[in-house]
């Protein structure tokens, strides 16, 4: 069981899917990642409390601080942002969804000892489908914007801490993430273009 006592803890094994009424939490192939799918599209993507209830129903105990730490970002088409994480004691779990446009979002397990270490899972999140992606602490995260004028809302279990931030190259050959854009199409932030290889990840997080 992987635990983090600042904002979130996985308190029980997650069933393949769990339903709280408004959102269904579906387990993804990479251990710990969840896709929240609305039972009815209207309003679900914007309802943070419904998302919290769905996570708790799936066995993830989210504290009240989860609602406080949110970030809204806007992107043009083909912008790639990632792969990023925050190290302990500031490790973040995050819940992502699109309020406008669409993104392809990805999480990569970098927890030493995890059965899915080095594996990734990606999902398309859009304002239309209302899907939300839960990426636990101990994961790299990234996204690619699929439309112009895309707006993304991320809720974090911990606030941003620049001293704890780390990055890995988005198209690292070891990870082999299957991005929806080519190297030539991708629009990168300067810092992301200079990020190191996945081989630099040495015991950033532990999974017991």
Spans of features found by a protein language model:
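Non-catalytic, conserved peripheral segments adjacent to functional cores
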Residues: 2-128, 147-149, 156-208
């Amino acid at each position: 069981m992987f635990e983090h006592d600042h904002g979130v803890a996985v308190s029980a094994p997650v069933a393949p899917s769990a339903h709280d009424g408004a959102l269904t939490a579906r387990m993804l192939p990479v251990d710990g990642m969840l896709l929240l799918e609305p039972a009815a599209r209207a309003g679900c993507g914007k309802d943070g409390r419904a998302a919290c209830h769905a996570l708790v129903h799936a066995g993830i105990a989210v504290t009240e601080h989860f609602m406080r730490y949110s970030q809204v970002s806007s992107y043009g088409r083909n912008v790639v942002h990632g792969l990023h994480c925050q190290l302990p004691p500031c490790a973040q779990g995050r819940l992502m969804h699109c309020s406008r446009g669409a993104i392809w979002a990805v999480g990569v397990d970098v927890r030493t000892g995890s059965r899915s270490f080095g594996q990734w899972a990606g999902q398309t999140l859009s304002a239309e489908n209302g899907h939300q992606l839960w990426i636990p602490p101990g994961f790299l995260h990234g996204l690619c914007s699929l439309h112009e004028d895309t707006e993304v809302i991320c809720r974090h279990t911990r606030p941003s801490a620049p001293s704890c931030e780390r990055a890995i190259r988005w198209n690292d050959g070891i990870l082999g993430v299957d991005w929806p854009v080519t190297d030539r199409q991708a629009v990168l932030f300067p810092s992301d273009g200079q990020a190191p290889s996945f081989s630099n990840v040495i015991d950033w997080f532990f999974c017991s």
